[in-house]
Amino acid sequence: IDPEGVLKNVPIKTYNHHLSHAAAGFQTSPYDDATVVVIDAIGEWDTISIWDAKYDRNGNACYTKLWGQKYPHSIGLMYSAFTKEVGLRPLDEEYILMGMAAYGQSHYKEAFKTVPLADEASITFRHNLHLGLPDEGKGGYGEDFDVAASAQELVESLIKIVIARA
């Protein structure tokens, strides 16, 4: 990358993935202090994080991580598993699944059986959803639009649990 060694003395700084999301949200907001919730598929190992964010008296943004959930327990990967279930590309076409949700009927209870939580309070899943939905409980949804509506309702209910924790 640097055959002539021009960059060898340039310091390299790394930043935590979820902290970067939190900073982008907080530092572009009009607030001086906030609770910031970050939810994604996987960033380094965190999948959910909750941060206390505020500016100190010198105007520097300060962050304290209050809670986090790690891979494989991931709302984002769960949504990707539903994306794969309807034939879309996981970790790429979730926006299509979200759009499809408006045209389907939610079968929330069936969706919840497919993706059982071991512990609701900590958003801990019984299965690693990185490779898709578990075989047991699959099917019975009907149209792909119904799968999308079920996934959307399930994700929204899980996000409410995370927000209540914050």
Please provide the spans of the model-predicted regions.
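Conserved phosphate-binding catalytic cores of ATP/NTP-utilizing and phosphoryl-transfer enzymes
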Residues: 14-37
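Phosphate/ATP-binding catalytic cores across multiple sugar-kinase/actin-like superfamilies
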Residues: 149-166
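A short helix-loop
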Residues: 38, 43-149, 165
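Solvent-exposed alpha-helices and their adjacent loops that cap or buttress functional pockets
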Residues: 5-6, 27-31, 41-44
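A residue-level signal for conserved active-site and pocket-lining positions in enzyme catalytic cores
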Residues: 22, 82, 159
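Ligand-binding pockets and gating/stacking loops
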Residues: 19-24, 140, 148, 152
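Conserved catalytic cysteine-centered active-site region
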Residues: 1-16
